[in-house]
């Protein structure tokens, strides 16, 4: 998976307003296991005003060149349902210091892994936004946020939908100078809390990073003399502590 894609999870939406809602959606990455079809995502509001939140879903599709594109979720062949993920409800009213949840529902075949961008965008409600509030309530809300400057931050998360018959098959090639971890399975695996540290000075460590290795892809790095590399390999519900070094 492209590094830029992994780092580009957060999107910021700036609006003019006084002290208001401050939402948080928890983890940036979520996973729908092979035996599940729904996932509860919670939205928290630590601010001092109600948050009106739109939930938008796009599918992430990789081209032949490996570059991801975000496209609208398509309808199924019968036209009566979606072929992918939908959020229910797609509009949330989250009270100050409160929490609300939306269910991410997957509909369609599970013969391969699929990826979705789920955006949680706080807005000042308008009539066309389909929030169940009256015109008077909308105006009162706008007036309460009209006396200063505030930043309302929206979040974009990544939702991995594993195939029905999820299979993990990790192949490791560890040599003196290079380490390669190849995903020969059919679903994403995670290299978590990856960092390198000096063998002679434990406090000399690099940044801690997280990597998603898609099916058929490889995570690899060149090993430097005198450094040890540590991480957790996560395959579904299994988590293994891994390390390698070049002495």
Label each region the model flagged.
Residues 4-15:
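Sec-dependent N-terminal signal peptides
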Residues 20-49, 165-174, 210:
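Beta-sheet-dominated interaction scaffolds and their linkers
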Residues 34-40, 100, 113-117, 175-177:
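Short, solvent-exposed loop/turn segments enriched in Ser/Thr/Gly
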Residues 43-49, 106, 179-187:
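Asparagine-centered strand-capping/turn motif at beta-strand->loop junctions
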Residues 51-79, 121, 186-201:
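Short acidic, flexible loop segments centered on an aromatic residue
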Residues 58-60, 107-166, 229-247:
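Terminal connector regions
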Residues 73-109, 202-228:
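Intrinsically disordered, low-complexity Pro/Gly/Ser/Thr-rich segments with frequent PxxP/GP/PP motifs
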Residues 173-247:
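Intrinsically disordered, low-complexity segments enriched in serine, threonine, and glycine
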């Amino acid at each position: 998976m492209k590094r830029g894609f992994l780092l580009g999870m957060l999107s910021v939406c700036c609006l003019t307003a006084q002290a208001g809602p401050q939402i948080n959606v928890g983890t940036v990455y979520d996973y729908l296991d092979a035996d599940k079809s729904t996932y509860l995502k919670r939205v928290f509001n630590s601010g001092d005003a109600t948050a009106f939140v739109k939930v938008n879903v796009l599918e992430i599709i990789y081209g032949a060149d490996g570059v991801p594109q975000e496209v609208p979720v398509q309808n199924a062949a019968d036209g009566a349902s979606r072929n992918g993920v939908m959020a229910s409800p797609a509009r949330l009213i989250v009270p100050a210091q409160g929490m609300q949840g939306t269910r991410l529902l997957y509909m369609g075949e599970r013969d391969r892994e699929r990826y979705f961008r789920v955006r949680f965008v706080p807005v000042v409600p308008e009539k066309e936004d389909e929030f169940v509030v009256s015109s008077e309530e909308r105006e009162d809300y706008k007036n309460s946020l009209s006396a200063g400057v505030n930043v309302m931050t929206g979040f974009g998360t990544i939702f991995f939908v594993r195939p029905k018959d999820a299979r993990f098959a990790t192949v490791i090639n560890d040599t003196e100078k290079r380490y390669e971890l190849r995903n020969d399975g059919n679903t994403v695996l995670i290299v978590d809390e990856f960092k390198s540290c000096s063998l002679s000075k434990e406090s000399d460590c690099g940044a801690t990073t997280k990597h998603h290795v898609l099916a058929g892809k490889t995570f690899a790095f060149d090993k430097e003399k005198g450094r040890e590399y540590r991480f957790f390999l996560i395959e579904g519900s299994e988590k293994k502590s891994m390390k390698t070094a070049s002495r």
